[in-house]
Amino acid sequence: MAPAASSAPRLLRAAMLLLLLVAAGRRAAGAPVVNELRCQCLQTLQGIHLKNIQSVKVTTPGPHCDQTEVIATLKTGQEVCLNPAAPMVKKIIDKMLN
């Protein structure tokens, strides 16, 4: 009877661990990505040739970041941050979004 009694706490611990892992997995699935909680652009380019750009996304200031961010997706799939104050970037935004 002693072996069954000692395996009960071990089984209970395993069940609790499994429950915690499942709960943590569900929480992680709905949690925002860390980079959404801060500015995404740490460095910016002053411009890039329009023919290399597939799309442009402009993010206005908000609780996650106090700056306007311009993120261009290149035709290669790479994302680059552009300086929203640069004259060339203003022209790119105007052509891509209007």
Swiss-Prot record:
Pfam families linked: IL8
Q: Does the keyword GTP-binding apply?
A: no
* Record carries keyword Signal: yes
Query: What is the protein's species of origin?
Result: Bos taurus
Annotated Gene Ontology cellular component terms: extracellular space
Print the organism lineage. Eukaryota, Metazoa, Chordata, Craniata, Vertebrata
A GO molecular function for this record?
growth factor activity
Q: Which protein are we looking at? A: Growth-regulated protein homolog gamma
The UniProt entry, under InterPro entries, shows:
Chemokine_b/g/d (IPR039809), Chemokine_CXC (IPR001089), Chemokine_CXC_CS (IPR018048), Chemokine_IL8-like_dom (IPR001811), CXC_Chemokine_domain (IPR033899), Interleukin_8-like_sf (IPR036048)
Q: Which family does it belong to?
A: Belongs to the intercrine alpha (chemokine CxC) family.
Q: Where in the cell is it found?
A: Secreted
Question: Which GO BP terms, alphabetically?
Answer: immune response; inflammatory response
* Signal peptide (UniProt feature, chain positions): 1-29
